Amino acid sequence: VGACSQAQRKTSCRSIFCCLLHWRRRRETCKFHGNRCVTSVSVALKDQRLRLLLTTYHQAFLSPGGGETELHQLAEYINDVGVRADLYGPNSRRLSAYDAVIHFSAHGGGEGLLQDIKAAGKPIVLIPNFNFFDQQHKANDVVQRHLDLADLVILRTNVEKDLCQKNFVIANDKIAVVPPGIAPGFGKPAEEGLFQSAYGLDRYILWVGQIAEHKRQLETIEALQGINIPLVFVGGYADKRYYDQCRAAAGDYVRFLPYMQPASEILRSAMQSCSVYLELGDDAPGFSSLEAALAGSPMVLNDHPWSREMFGSLQIYVEANNPTAIRAAVTTALDTRTRNQLTEEMRSRHLQPGPTRHLLELLKLKVGR
């Protein structure tokens, strides 16, 4: 190689170092000896990618639901597009190793963590996962503290942005709207008839999500009694007392199935094959409604501003506290059998990794990358 100092060789000829990052094979020319020192080496290039820490309030995973699933999926999507993301916990690194923090939820208990992150000088992106449509919410002070600590607030719809600015103190340039994303697996067709074969069904009405009082599954069960098409619930429950009430009110036509892995073939099959997809809670529908729209399912939804912005006028909307209207809407959807009205729009606007790339572009502006 020629005579050069140990320091020179360390930065040139022998630029091979141990690392857990991705390895790449390349030809490297010694900066001290030119072409006389060309060698083929495995070099672990210095990782210049963003590194993000994802956090939430500490009680979140005591009773995990859709929000916790979304947090896990967000970490996966971020890593898939080339940015390193870790969930906060025993296996995450020191805070100083991260360029920014994405905090999920404005639930009480997260403020102390965010205060420490802010004091360390790390940019905070907040995804509130808060029901801005509830004008009687008692946690407004807690939410305001989260908003104050954030450098960037990501909301899902323009109607949520308007409500946030109406009811809280926040600068317009601190808020951005990023459409909710659908797991890319939902874009794949499932084996035809898989769900029906597994559960002995033909036509059926589907509702995916946690059983909870504010979701109004009990009222739906009562409204659809005698409709003669099975009503299938997929998901766990938050309140066993309410779940037991639903089971007691359910006749033979109602099926309660356990939680299914997001984007799994059995869940995709359930959505792609159902006669009607139903979701009638007091709050905005969950991500499952977007997944059902991508699958082409006819849908009956609670008449909610979030739904109107997401789906326009192509779905059937109904007041969730009106049993007669619920039954009439479901009957209409069953008779119409119109499918695939929103499939292409959902694919282009909501299918991941598009929304995650949008989020990261906004975040990079905040951290100067």
Model feature map: region roles:
Residues S269-A284, S297:
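Acidic donor-binding loop of glycosyltransferase active sites
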Residues D282, S297, L301-F311, A320-N321:
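Short glycine-rich donor-binding/catalytic loop of glycosyltransferases
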Residues V1, Q196-K215, I221-V232:
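Conserved donor-binding/catalytic core segment of Leloir-type glycosyltransferases
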Residues V1-L21, G66, L334-G368:
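A charged, aromatic-enriched C-terminal amphipathic alpha-helix characteristic of glycosyltransferases
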